[in-house]
Design a protein with these regions (language model features):
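Alpha-helix capping/hinge segments and adjacent helical runs
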Residues: 4, 20, 266, 270-313
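A short core secondary-structure module
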Residues: 94, 104, 108-154
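Secondary-structure edge/capping motif, primarily at the C-terminal ends of alpha-helices
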Residues: 220-225, 250-258, 286
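A structural signal for short hydrophobic beta-strand segments in well-ordered beta-sheet cores
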Residues: 96-99
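A short, Trp-centered hydrophobic/proline-enriched beta-strand micro-motif
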Residues: 74-82, 126
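Glycine-rich phosphate/pyrophosphate-binding beta-alpha loops
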Residues: 87, 112-117, 159-160, 312-313
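Glycine-rich beta->alpha junctions and the first turn(s) of the following alpha-helix
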Residues: 151-248, 310-313
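Internal helix-loop-helix
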Residues: 4-65, 69-75, 116-122, 243, ...
Length: 313
C-alpha cells in the first residue's frame, strides 16, 4: 500500500485504468532499480502483473471497474489456480469442474502449488465447464473469492522451512455468473495469455535478485578459500556470463515493444530456470561439507536457501 500511495503499482497499465502508461524503457528501469536496492518481494505482484493485464485485455468494463482499483491500491491480493495433482506440466489435463446453476458458477476439485493462497482474497481458476471435454477444449477462466464455505486452503511445508505454496480444495464453492473472463470454453486462450504476462518486464527485476545471490556466493567463496579452486572460479565466471546473457536476451525481446511475448518468453523462463539451478549447485559446492547440515546463520543459511529454492524453478 505504501508503493501504491506513491503511484508505483500498474506502471504500464493504461491511464484509463489508473496506470502510468510508462514506456517499456522506464518500466525496465523501475524493476531493475527496485531489485538493485534490495526491495522485498511484493505481496500484490500476482494481481498487478498477471490478473490486471488479463482483465485489461479480456475482461468486461464491469470486471475492470470492480477488480482493478483494489489491485492498484494494494488492498486486494490474488493467487493463481492452475496446477493440479494430475495437471502440472500437462496443464490441459485439468479435472477441476465448474457448472452454471441458479445464477452462480459452482466448483469441485483441487489445485496445488498455489502461491500465497493463504494471504489472498481471490483466486483465478481454470476449470472444466464442458462435461466430457478433454485437453484444451471446454475450459473456462473463473474469478473466485476464497473466503467462503466450500474452499479449504492447506499450506505445503517446503524444504526451505517456509510455506509459500498451498493446496486449495473446492467442495461446493461458488462465484457469481459474471465472474468469468471471456466466454465459457475460452479458458485455455485466456490462461495462455496470462502466462505470457508472467514472463514480462518484472523478470528483469528477478535477474537483479539473481545478481545479489551471485555476489553472495562470490563473497562466500572468497571468505572460505573456495575461489582458489580453478573449477569453482570457472563456474563463477560462467554464472556471470550467463546472467548477462539472460538480461541481453530479455532486453532484446522487450525492445520489440511487447511486454507479453508468448513463446519466446517461455523459452526465456526455461533458460532462467536452468541458470538458477546451476547457481544453487555451485552454492553447495562452495560451502563444501559446511553446507551438509542445516545452517542457522548467514551467509551459509542464505546460500542453502538459494539451493533449495532453485530446485523448484
Amino acid at each position: 500500500q505504501v508503493m501504491a500511495s506513491g503511484g508505483w503499482i500498474g506502471l504500464g497499465w493504461p491511464r484509463a485504468h489508473g496506470g502510468r502508461e510508462l514506456p517499456v524503457s522506464l518500466q525496465v528501469a523501475f524493476h531493475e532499480e527496485y531489485a538493485r536496492a534490495g526491495g522485498p518481494g511484493r505481496m500484490g505482484h500476482i494481481g498487478e502483473t498477471l490478473m490486471a493485464p488479463t482483465l485489461i485485455d479480456f475482461g468486461t468494463p464491469e470486471q475492470q471497474a470492480r477488480f482493478l482499483p483494489g489491485i492498484r491500491e494494494g488492498k486486494v491480493f490474488w493467487c493463481q489456480g492452475y496446477s493440479e495433482p494430475g495437471a502440472g506440466s500437462d496443464l490441459a489435463a485439468i479435472r477441476t469442474r465448474c457448472w452454471l446453476e441458479d445464477g452462480k458458477w459452482h466448483l469441485q476439485g483441487q489445485k496445488v502449488w498455489t502461491s500465497l493462497a493463504h494471504e489472498s482474497e481471490w483466486i483465478f481458476v481454470i476449470a472444466r465447464s464442458t462435461p466430457g471435454s478433454v485437453g484444451r477444449d471446454g475450459l473456462s477462466f473463473l474469478l473466485v473469492p476464497l473466503d467462503q464455505p466450500g474452499v479449504e486452503i492447506r499450506p505445503i511445508r517446503q524444504m526451505t522451512g517456509e510455506a509459500e505454496f498451498n493446496e486449495v480444495f473446492f467442495d461446493g464453492a461458488c462465484t457469481a455468473a459474471d465472474c468469468i473472463v471471456g466466454a465459457p470454453g475460452d479458458g485455455w486462450k485466456v490462461a495462455m495469455a496470462l502466462l505470457g504476462y508472467e514472463r514480462g518486464l518484472s523478470t528483469l527485476g528477478q535477474q537483479m535478485h539473481f545478481s545479489h545471490e551471485l555476489q553472495l556466493l562470490v563473497d562466500a567463496a572468497h571468505a572460505c578459500g573456495a575461489d582458489q579452486d580453478l573449477s569453482i572460479r570457472r563456474r563463477i565466471a560462467d554464472a556471470w556470463i550467463g546472467l548477462r546473457t539472460l538480461r541481453a536476451n530479455a532486453l532484446r525481446i522487450f525492445a520489440r515493444g511487447e511486454a507479453a511475448v508468448g513463446p519466446e518468453a517461455l523459452v526465456y523462463k526455461y533458460a532462467w530456470s536452468n541458470w538458477h539451478r546451476n547457481l544453487g549447485e555451485l552454492a553447495m559446492d562452495v560451502m563444501g561439507t559446511a553446507g551438509d547440515l542445516e545452517a542457522q546463520e548467514d551467509p551459509l543459511r542464505r546460500l542453502q536457501q538459494v539451493f533449495f529454492f532453485s530446485r523448484a524453478d
